[in-house]
Structures are given as structure tokens and as C-alpha cells.
A protein has these predicted regions:
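Conserved RNA-binding domains used in RNP assembly and mRNA/RNA metabolism
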Residues: 1-122
């Protein structure tokens, strides 16, 4: 997948920040990012995050075909996003490829920000 590291961080308290992502460290449950407005790199704990949105940078036709199950993710704040993912409940997060990829190519969902997950029938 092509990307330039530009992401949108969505926090559990409701605010969002545009940033450049350096790395998602699932083992330590943190990510390293540089907020667009600050310019300084910071470590963001998963406990503060809801999800990380990766804006679409290429035409939809050029996006990689997602693999996994069709699921509906409901966050603690009531937002529901449907998409394709390979979900492992043991992992601290997972990538969700939204059904509507016109804005976001993929979303990193933080497991502890989820209220429920439903596997949808085809």
C-alpha cells in the first residue's frame, strides 16, 4: 500500500489530530507520530486512542483488495464502521478496510475502544 504517513488520529475524548505517523508499536501499545500543528514527535498510548484513519491517497481502483471477514465495529461512543478485517481478539488492534473507501484507505482500530464487533453474514 502506498501512503505518505499522513493520518488522522481519533481520540477517545472526541478530538482529532492530523499527524504524520512514524510507527504503530502494537507490542508496547503506542504509536509514534508528529502532529501537523506541533511539529514535534510524540508517543501516543493506545489507551488514549479510538482509531487511526489512513486517508486515501490513490484512486479507489488502485487500492489493494482487502481480505478477511465482513464485520461491523461499534465503538464505545456509539459510532459504527463496517468493513473487512482479519480480527484477532488477542491483539491490541487491527486494520479495518472500510466498505466505503472513498475517504479512508484503511483504519487501525484500537481493541479497547470497541464496544462490540459483529461478523456480518454475506
Amino acid at each position: 500500500m502506498q501512503d505518505d504517513g499522513k493520518v488522522i488520529l481519533r481520540f477517545r475524548d472526541g478530538h482529532t489530530e492530523r499527524a504524520t505517523l512514524a510507527v504503530i508499536d502494537a507490542a508496547r501499545e503506542v504509536l509514534d507520530a508528529t502532529p501537523d500543528q506541533d511539529g514535534g514527535s510524540e508517543e501516543v498510548p493506545f489507551s488514549a486512542l479510538k482509531a487511526v484513519f489512513f486517508p486515501r491517497m490513490v484512486p479507489v481502483e488502485q487500492l489493494e483488495e482487502p481480505h478477511g471477514s465482513l464485520i461491523a465495529v461499534e465503538f464505545a461512543d456509539g459510532e459504527v464502521i463496517r468493513g473487512t478485517a482479519t480480527y484477532n481478539p488477542e491483539a491490541s488492534g487491527f486494520f479495518l478496510f472500510p466498505l466505503d473507501r472513498s475517504k479512508n484507505e484503511r483504519i487501525f482500530v484500537v481493541r479497547d475502544a470497541i464496544a462490540s464487533i459483529e461478523v456480518e453474514k454475506l
